[in-house]
Design a protein with these regions (language model features):
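Active-site/ligand-binding-proximal alpha/beta "capping" segment
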Residues: 183-236
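Short beta->alpha connector loops at strand-helix junctions that form conserved
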Residues: 70-71, 112, 138-139, 161, ...
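Amphipathic alpha-helical repeat scaffolds
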Residues: 29, 115-123, 235-243
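Boundary-proximal intrinsically disordered activation/regulatory segments immediately upstream
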Residues: 1-53, 141-142
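Glycine/small-residue-rich loop that forms an oxyanion/phosphate-binding "nest" at active or ligand-binding sites
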Residues: 67-92
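RNA substrate-binding interface of SAM-dependent RNA methyltransferases
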Residues: 38, 96, 100-187
Length: 259
C-alpha cells in the first residue's frame, strides 16, 4: 500500500518546479518501467501491482531504493494518466554536462520554443532511432521531464541528452566556428536535393511561429520538405515532430551515400 505522504510526493512530481528541486521525474507503464530497470537507471521509487513486481528478475529490483506494492486504486490516485498502468517509477535525473565540442563532430538538433509535450517526446524518439545523441532546447521549450514528454518518447530519453540553453549564444558560437546550421524554413531548398553533411546542426522552430527572428541570421543552409500532394486545402504543413522525422531520415540516407 502506498502511504498518503508518499502519494502526495509522487503526485507533486507532476509539477516542473518540484521536479527541478528534487532532481526526480516520473515514468509510467509496464514496458517503460522494465526498460528503465534493464538499463540500470537510478530508480528512487518503484510502485507497482504485486503481480508486476513478481514478474521482474531479482537483479532488476536490487538497484531500486524503495519498492512499494500498490493496488489499482493506489496507482489510479498517483498516475498522471486517465487509465493507470501496473507500474510507476520515480527516476533520478542524470547529471550530464553540456559539451558543445560535439557540435563539430556529429549531427545535433536545436529546438526553438517547441511547446507541445507530444512533439518533443516524438522528436526525442526519432533522434534516438536515427542515432542523434544531443538535443539543445531553448529555455522556453516544454520540459523534457514532463510526464507527457516521457510517455511519447517511449523511453528514448535514456539514449538522448537534452539540454536547455541560450540558443542565440549557442548558434552564434557555432556560426563563428563555421559549423553548418540547417534551418527548416518554408522558403528553403528541398531537402531531397540539398547537399547534406554528416555533421552540423538541424534547427527546428515553434509549432506555429517557426524559428525566431533573432536566430535566422545564423542559418547557413535553408531547407524544407516539399509538398508532393496536389491538395490545395487542409494540408498546408507538417507538424514539427513529423518534419523532424523526415529530416533526420534524409540526413541518415545522405550519410549512407557518403560512406
Amino acid at each position: 500500500m502506498v502511504s498518503k505522504s508518499k502519494m502526495n510526493f509522487i503526485i507533486s512530481l507532476q509539477k516542473k518546479k518540484v521536479r527541478e528541486e528534487e532532481r526526480l521525474y516520473l515514468i509510467e507503464g509496464d514496458k517503460l518501467v522494465k526498460e528503465f530497470l534493464a538499463a540500470k537507471m537510478p530508480v528512487r521509487i518503484l510502485a507497482a501491482r504485486p503481480e508486476f513486481l513478481n514478474s521482474l528478475p531479482l537483479v532488476h529490483k536490487q538497484g531500486v531504493r524503495e519498492v512499494i506494492p500498490a493496488s489499482y486504486d493506489d496507482l489510479k490516485k498517483i498516475s498522471s494518466l486517465k487509465t493507470p498502468h501496473n507500474a510507476l517509477a520515480v527516476i533520478e535525473m542524470p547529471d550530464i554536462k553540456m559539451d558543445t565540442d560535439n557540435l563539430r563532430k556529429e549531427l545535433s538538433v536545436v529546438l526553438d520554443c517547441v511547446q507541445d509535450p507530444g512533439n518533443l517526446g516524438t522528436i526525442i524518439r526519432a533522434a534516438a532511432w536515427f542515432g542523434i545523441r544531443n538535443i539543445y532546447c531553448s529555455e522556453n521549450c516544454v520540459d523534457v521531464y514532463n510526464p507527457k514528454v516521457i510517455q511519447s518518447s517511449m523511453g528514448a530519453v535514456i539514449h538522448v541528452n537534452v539540454f536547455y540553453t541560450d540558443l542565440r549564444k549557442l548558434l552564434e558560437s557555432a556560426f563563428s566556428a563555421k559549423i553548418r546550421i540547417y534551418g527548416a524554413l518554408v522558403n528553403g531548398d528541398s531537402i531531397y536535393s540539398h547537399k547534406l553533411d554528416n555533421t552540423g546542426i538541424i534547427l527546428l522552430g515553434n509549432e506555429s511561429k517557426g524559428i525566431s527572428e533573432e536566430l535566422l541570421p545564423y542559418i547557413t543552409d535553408k531547407i524544407m520538405i516539399p509538398k508532393i500532394s496536389r491538395a490545395t486545402s487542409g494540408i498546408d504543413s507538417l507538424n514539427v515532430s513529423m518534419a523532424a522525422s523526415v529530416i533526420f531520415s534524409e540526413f541518415t540516407r545522405s550519410k549512407g551515400r557518403q560512406l
